């Protein structure tokens, strides 16, 4: 503790100034020290700030006297002389304060002598009473536990009184955990006496509810406080992990490619073989012309017409009355052969007609070309438009003729005459009429 004589001397020193405020003196003293002794003030201001936050008034243990507790008081008092002069005590106090930078590393020296209790006398007395009560209750519960464990040797009245005593006692979770009284009471839940059995079940239910409430409260407190960073492994992993490289997102984006699939297919012929550059350019020019559309359309229609007989053919549903299915299969096979032969015959005129049309297109009269040369752009456009419509009409007529020929060649399914069955009743009736 700080010597009372040093504080009294300084108290008298400040009181001589009259009605001056002590806090005003402190403020002005700091200003004067910072102005007159700036270097020394810088070296000591850390200790001054530490002194401001470390000074506290504590109540002495054993009496109600208030004492000032300042770290490093004992060392300062050891260095003071026996004359009790206030000036020397204060100077040595400041010497200790100024030399505290070395003592920060050795601040743990003599901590047992410098520790001052932060509890007041009433708090310390209440704490001691609580500890004493805990020990007394624990001893009583341990005594009752021994009685309950020896339930075979004890009468029912003693067991019942022990359980009632436990019910009247206010037990907490610490006592239940330290004494393990729950195991002893749980063994009485199947006792022969109804009162003992019922009282044991009641105690177990109350203690279980108490423990559940304590667990829930603990979880809520820990959840509110939050887990420390050391308990969170992800934080440690992030700190110990290598720093991530500053990747640029644009590096991973694919470069734009100007190659189009349409150009790839244009460079191939119908068989999948690559064309020459000249053939590729000429094919591109022919595709742009409208005549190519007129040439391709009848080909698709011709293929559709050729496939029509095969799609329209259905197996005959005629059945043989003799019960055997073999003649039915033979008849369907013969019919399919006849239809294929007729289709092949119908294809011959179509194949012969195609070159005729192309030859007619290829043969263009010379005077007609000369007339086209003399016309302007609008007249040429109208002429090409009329020719295109005529070619469309020609192909439509050819398409109708082919469909009519194919439909005439397909045999009608309903034309086959079904054999007439003779009813046995009619023959018997005729036979009876003949006898008459």
Swiss-Prot record:
Q: One matching Pfam family, short form?
A: Med26
Mark out the compositionally biased spans (Polar residues): 427-436
Gene label: MED26B
InterPro entries listed in its UniProt record: TFIIS/CRSP70_N_sub (IPR003617), TFIIS/LEDGF_dom_sf (IPR035441), TFIIS_N (IPR017923)
Physiological role:
Component of the Mediator complex, a coactivator involved in the regulated transcription of nearly all RNA polymerase II-dependent genes. Mediator functions as a bridge to convey information from gene-specific regulatory proteins to the basal RNA polymerase II transcription machinery. The Mediator complex, having a compact conformation in its free form, is recruited to promoters by direct interactions with regulatory proteins and serves for the assembly of a functional preinitiation complex with RNA polymerase II and the general transcription factors.
The coiled-coil regions, if any, are: 382-402
Q: How does it assemble?
A: Component of the Mediator complex.
Q: Name one GO molecular function term.
A: translation elongation factor activity
What is the protein name stated in its UniProt record? Probable mediator of RNA polymerase II transcription subunit 26b
């Amino acid at each position: 503790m700080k010597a009372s004589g040093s504080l009294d001397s300084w108290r008298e020193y400040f009181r001589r100034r009259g009605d001056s405020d002590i806090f005003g003196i402190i403020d002005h003293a700091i200003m004067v020290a910072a102005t007159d002794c700036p270097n020394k003030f810088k070296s000591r201001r850390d200790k001054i700030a530490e002194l401001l936050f470390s000074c506290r008034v504590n109540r002495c243990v054993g009496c109600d006297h208030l004492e000032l507790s300042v770290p490093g008081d004992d060392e300062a008092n050891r260095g003071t002389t026996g004359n009790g002069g206030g000036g020397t005590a204060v100077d040595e106090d400041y010497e200790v304060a100024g030399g505290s930078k070395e003592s920060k590393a050795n601040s743990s020296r003599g901590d047992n002598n410098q520790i001052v209790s932060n509890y007041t006398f009433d708090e310390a007395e209440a704490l001691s009473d609580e500890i004493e009560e805990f020990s007394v209750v624990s001893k009583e519960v341990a005594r009752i536990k021994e009685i309950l464990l020896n339930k075979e040797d004890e009468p029912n009245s003693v067991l019942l009184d022990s359980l009632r005593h436990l019910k009247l006692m206010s037990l907490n979770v610490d006592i239940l955990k330290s004494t393990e009284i729950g195991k002893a009471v749980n063994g009485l839940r199947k006792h022969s006496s109804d009162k003992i059995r019922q009282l044991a079940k009641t105690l177990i239910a109350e203690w279980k509810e108490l423990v559940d409430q304590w667990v829930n409260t603990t979880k809520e407190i820990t959840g509110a406080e939050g887990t420390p960073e050391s308990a969170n492994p992800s934080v440690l992993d992030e700190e110990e992990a290598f720093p991530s490289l500053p990747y640029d997102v644009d590096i991973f984006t694919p470069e734009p490619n100007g190659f189009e699939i349409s150009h790839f297919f244009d460079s191939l012929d119908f068989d999948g073989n690559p064309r020459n550059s000249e053939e590729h350019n000429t094919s591109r020019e022919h595709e742009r012309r409208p005549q190519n559309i007129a040439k391709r359309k009848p080909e698709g229609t011709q293929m559709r017409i050729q496939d029509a007989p095969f799609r329209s053919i259905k197996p005959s549903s005629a059945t043989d009355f003799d019960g055997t299915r073999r003649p039915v299969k033979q008849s369907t096979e013969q019919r399919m052969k006849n239809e294929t032969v007729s289709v092949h015959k119908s294809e011959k005129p179509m194949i012969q007609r195609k070159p005729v049309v192309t030859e007619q297109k290829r043969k263009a009269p010379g005077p007609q070309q000369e007339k086209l040369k003399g016309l302007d752009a609008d007249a040429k456009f109208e002429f090409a438009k009329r020719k295109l419509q005529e070619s469309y009409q020609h192909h439509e007529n050819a398409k109708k003729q082919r469909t009519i020929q194919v439909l005439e060649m397909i045999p009608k399914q309903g034309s086959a005459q079904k054999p007439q069955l003779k009813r046995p009743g009619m023959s018997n009736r005729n036979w009876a009429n003949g006898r008459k």
